[in-house]
């Protein structure tokens, strides 16, 4: 787990925490591009992640709501956590993984290098595989973060690696626009792991 801090300039001074949790390992072939595909996660690893999270979340008893991506692999973990914490569960499409278009369901190694090169050369604007651009991902995550500030309360988000990286990028750069693929966060949150985000609203 790693803590990040971001302070937006607003009229208030209330600090809130967001738990950004990645789903457990999905039941897919290694190296598969699965983005928006609705695949399940390993149930035993999901339960293990839930146990690990409960130990950490016991320190944040004030959390009243959990938001989850609507994909099966995230809802498996979200449902367990919501039941164990006895808090509200809300499905949020904006928390879904990036849409990789026609390349979803293909192995990354089988995707033409020319397609990946075009994406990295126009990283903010190019819709990879005809799906979603990195800029579109960043803008919807920016909206989520703005909505979170307005709630003025700690939250749990059960989501995906791409969304977590988008949050990290926005926190480091202060805007939902990326100039180069080289600026994209390299650190990956492991399956079933999490980071926390402290925001001053």
PLM features: residue spans?
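Short, Lys/Arg-enriched N-terminal segments with co-localized hydrophobic residues
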Residues: 3-15
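Generic beta-sheet signal
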Residues: 18, 64, 151-162
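Loop-to-helix element that buttresses phosphate recognition and phosphoryl-transfer chemistry
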Residues: 18-76, 130-141
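Phosphate-coordination/substrate-recognition cap region in phosphate-metabolizing enzymes
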Residues: 52-115
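Active-site catalytic microenvironments for nucleophilic, acid-base chemistry
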Residues: 80, 84, 147, 170-174
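Short glycine/proline- and acidic residue-enriched helix-loop micro-motifs
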Residues: 116-135
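GST superfamily/GST-like fold recognition
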Residues: 161-165, 195
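Domain-level recognition of soluble alpha/beta enzyme cores
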Residues: 174-201
């Amino acid at each position: 787990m790693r803590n990040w801090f971001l302070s937006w300039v607003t009229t208030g001074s209330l600090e809130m925490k967001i738990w950004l949790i990645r789903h457990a390992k999905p039941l897919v072939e290694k190296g598969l591009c699965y983005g928006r595909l609705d695949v399940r996660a390993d149930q035993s690893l999901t339960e293990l992640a839930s146990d690990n999270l409960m130990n950490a979340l016991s320190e944040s008893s004030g959390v009243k709501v959990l938001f989850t991506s609507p994909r099966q692999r995230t809802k498996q973990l979200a449902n367990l956590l919501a039941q164990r914490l006895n808090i509200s569960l809300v499905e949020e499409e904006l928390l879904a993984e990036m849409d990789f278009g026609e390349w979803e369901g293909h192995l990354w190694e089988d995707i033409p290098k020319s397609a990946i090169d075009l994406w990295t050369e126009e990283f903010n604007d190019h819709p990879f595989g005809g799906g979603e651009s990195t800029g579109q991902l960043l803008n919807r995550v920016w909206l989520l973060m703005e909505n979170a500030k307005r709630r003025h309360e700690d939250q749990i988000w059960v989501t995906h690696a791409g969304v977590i990286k988008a949050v990290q990028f926005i926190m480091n750069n202060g805007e939902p626009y990326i100039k180069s693929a080289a600026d994209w966060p390299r650190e990956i949150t492991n399956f079933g792991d999490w980071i926390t985000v402290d925001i001053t609203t």
